[in-house]
Structure formats: structure tokens, C-alpha cells
Amino acid sequence: METWALILAAGQGSRLLSTIGIAKQFFVWKGIPLYWQSVLQFMHCARIRGVVLVFPSEVKDNEEKVVDRLAAQYDLRLPYIVISGGKLRQDSVKNALNTLPKNCSHVLIHDAARPFISPKLINNVIEVLEAGAVGVVPGISVTDTIKQVIQGEVIVTRPREQLIAVQTPQGFHLKTIVEGHNRATLEKWTVTDDASLLELCGHTVQVINGEIENRKISFPQDLLYMVEQPKTTVPIVGYGYDVHKYVTEDQINQPIRSMRLGGISIPNAPNVVAHSDGDVLLHALMDALLGCIGGGDIGLHFPDSDKRYDGINSAILLDHVLTKVLESSIKIVHMDATIVAQLPKISQYREAIRSNLSRLLDLDLANVNIKATTEEGLGFTGECKGIKAIVIVTAIRIS
């Protein structure tokens, strides 16, 4: 499954434009435009393989330069495409769908005016797609009574228990949503969200719980939600340790994996025995993160007796752990790791590993440290029988 994200920033934003003189998606918050807040959240999800950003045609060239600068500044280790939007929202989406690579199978479509999207919600949408859904939308319960009105007169009052307020990102099987947009062009349909096209084509759209915090910035008063309130913090430290054996002749019937460290492939290194992908560094990191929240260890969450995790990319498991960290109101501030092995030599891969972990953890590169050492020929690592990793994570609990 190859999933890309489309971030729509091509709207006129007329409500805010008339008040503060700038379209909402370009409003600068915490030093960056609103649309980049969404890019950062998608960037930290291992399942996302690339991003398409859609801007008004008159500012596309300028914003492409801004995106290039931000991508370098924030070490965006994802392919990205910058394109011009169309007259209507659905025209912008169709333009973006046509730019996706051939190997893309699924897409998440997100409004840039929702900067408070969480990695947890992104992962929840993707998980439903992985289970076979062709369309999925997040939604929250409606608390107000909703009435249908024509020319100032109430026509009908809708039972609010049957209603939800739909959010983005909305997730789709790519071929299905492309067919929906193509049919919309033929039938001259105009819709306000992409899920409506699947509904009109007779497809089932699944609904998952959205997030109240995932609000849309539309009116000037919405900017008040962007003012952060004072919070108290408590420092936390998590410790993680993991070991993997190297493959020997008597282990040829066990699961054998090519070596990966911190999500980076290490060529010409010894193969490891492992149920998942055998990334000893990510496994130690996950244990350290779980230690921060009192969450047990990775064996509890991803047992090696479960075939679902056979050969799985450990970055996907890390996504699940990071979601639990976010749910616990924990903010990671630093990680320090030591890799212990006689072989392979880590020095030439150190910066690639740091950069990838910086992206996955949403940390500045300066707050990610990777060390490597040997045990001077002693023990199982010194005898080239295996590798181990030790990780210390520093975090704060916010309340």
C-alpha cells in the first residue's frame, strides 16, 4: 500500500482575507504558514510516502520557493510536488490526483485550513484503508440542532443523532476517487467534499471518530484557538534496550532479515534473526517511549506470536507507539542512543540515521544523538554474534 497526502491550499480564504489581509492558509503561526503545519504532521507518519501541495495559480511559483526553503529547513525526507489549483475545490483535487506517481494506491486529502491535525488521526484513517475500505472520513458529533431552511423558513429539523460534522483528512482508494472525479466532470456535479463523489457513485464511505481539536480556521475569531494557554510540565525519562542475533548456519530455518538501523538499510552488514524487520535501534527506541508512558514493552504490544507483525517495517510500529505517547500528553524533547556491535561499522550511516529519527520523532536534529561502540572483542557482540542498542528518551508530560 503506497499512500500520498494532498494538502489543499488553493482556496481564496475570503473571510479572513477581508479582515487580516491574507488568505488563511498563508497565515503565519509559530513562524511558518498554516499549510506547513499540516505538512509537518504528515511528515511524521511512516505510512505517508509523499505530499502534493496545491496553491492558487497566481502564487504557485512563489510558494514553491517557500516550500523548497521549508523542506530544507525541516529536513522533509519525503518526495513533494507543488502544483496550481483550479477554479473549484474539486478542480484542485483533480489536478493533484493527476500528478500522483504510478505506484500510489491510496490518497489522503486534507484542507490546509485544518492545522491541528494529529498523527493519530492520520494513522486511524490509513488503518481503515488498509482494512479494505475505499473511502473513509473522520467526523465529530453535532451538538447544535440542525434545521434545513429555504428563504428564511424552516423546512425540516434533522435528528442530530444521525448527523456528524465531517473533517479532513479524507482517505480513498486512489482508482476509486479518480473515477469519482472523472464522473463529476461528465455529470457536472459540484460537491464540497470528496467523499460526496463516492456516495454519488454508489460506494460506501466509512466514518471514524474525528477530533474536536482538528478545527477549521475560517473566521477571524477562530484565530483565538491558536493562542496557547500556560501549561505545567513534568520531566520524564524512558530507557530502552534491545538485542538481535546474527544469522549462523544453525539458524537458517529462523526468520532472517537484512539489517536496518533507525529505519535506514545497512548494506553488506550481517543479517539478523527477527520476527519483524529486526531494526534493533527502533525497537530500543519504542521501549524507551513506552517507558515514558508506563506502557510496558514492545513484546506486549507487538508479540512475535502474531503473524501480522511478520517482517513488518518497524517504523510502522513506531507510529503506533508515538500515537500512544501523544494520547498520554507526552512531548518528546531528546533522544540519545548507543549502538553496540563489532560489525557493522556505523560511522558512514550515522547522519542518515539521525536525520530519519529526527523526522520520525519531530525533533530538531540537535536533539537526536547516535553513538556507536564495540565491546573490545568481549561478549556476544565482540564475537560478532549479534548487535544491541540502548536508547534514553527525555520527555515532558504536559498538563
UniProtKB/Swiss-Prot annotation:
Q: Where does 4-CDP-2-C-methyl-D-erythritol 2-phosphate bind?
A: 242-244, 275-276, 297-299, 302-306, 373-376, 380
In residue numbers, the region (2-C-methyl-D-erythritol 2,4-cyclodiphosphate synthase) covers: 236-399
What this protein needs as a cofactor is: a divalent metal cation
Q: Give residue numbers for the site Transition state stabilizer.
A: R15, K24, H275, T374
Q: What is its EC number?
A: 2.7.7.60, 4.6.1.12
Q: Pfam families, from UniProt?
A: IspD, YgbB
The entry's a divalent metal cation-binding residues are D242, H244, H283
**Annotated site (Positions MEP for the nucleophilic attack), which positions?**
R160, K216
Q: In which pathway does it act?
A: Isoprenoid biosynthesis; isopentenyl diphosphate biosynthesis via DXP pathway; isopentenyl diphosphate from 1-deoxy-D-xylulose 5-phosphate: step 2/6; Isoprenoid biosynthesis; isopentenyl diphosphate biosynthesis via DXP pathway; isopentenyl diphosphate from 1-deoxy-D-xylulose 5-phosphate: step 4/6
Entry keywords, A to Z: Isoprene biosynthesis, Lyase, Metal-binding, Multifunctional enzyme, Nucleotidyltransferase, Transferase
Q: Which reaction does it catalyse?
A: 2-C-methyl-D-erythritol 4-phosphate + CTP + H(+) = 4-CDP-2-C-methyl-D-erythritol + diphosphate; 4-CDP-2-C-methyl-D-erythritol 2-phosphate = 2-C-methyl-D-erythritol 2,4-cyclic diphosphate + CMP
| Annotated segments matching region 2-C-methyl-D-erythritol 4-phosphate cytidylyltransferase | 1-235
Q: Which InterPro entries would you find in this protein's record?
A: IspD (IPR001228), IspD/F (IPR026596), IspD/TarI (IPR034683), ISPD_synthase_CS (IPR018294), MECDP_synthase (IPR003526), MECDP_synthase_CS (IPR020555), MECDP_synthase_sf (IPR036571), Nucleotide-diphossugar_trans (IPR029044)
Record-level GO BP terms = isopentenyl diphosphate biosynthetic process, methylerythritol 4-phosphate pathway; terpenoid biosynthetic process
In terms of NCBIfam families, this protein maps to: ispD (TIGR00453), ispF (TIGR00151)
Give the similarity note: In the N-terminal section; belongs to the IspD/TarI cytidylyltransferase family. IspD subfamily. In the C-terminal section; belongs to the IspF family.
What does the function comment of this entry state? Bifunctional enzyme that catalyzes the formation of 4-diphosphocytidyl-2-C-methyl-D-erythritol from CTP and 2-C-methyl-D-erythritol 4-phosphate (MEP) (IspD), and catalyzes the conversion of 4-diphosphocytidyl-2-C-methyl-D-erythritol 2-phosphate (CDP-ME2P) to 2-C-methyl-D-erythritol 2,4-cyclodiphosphate (ME-CPP) with a corresponding release of cytidine 5-monophosphate (CMP) (IspF).
Q: What is this protein called?
A: Bifunctional enzyme IspD/IspF
What gene does this protein come from?
A: ispDF
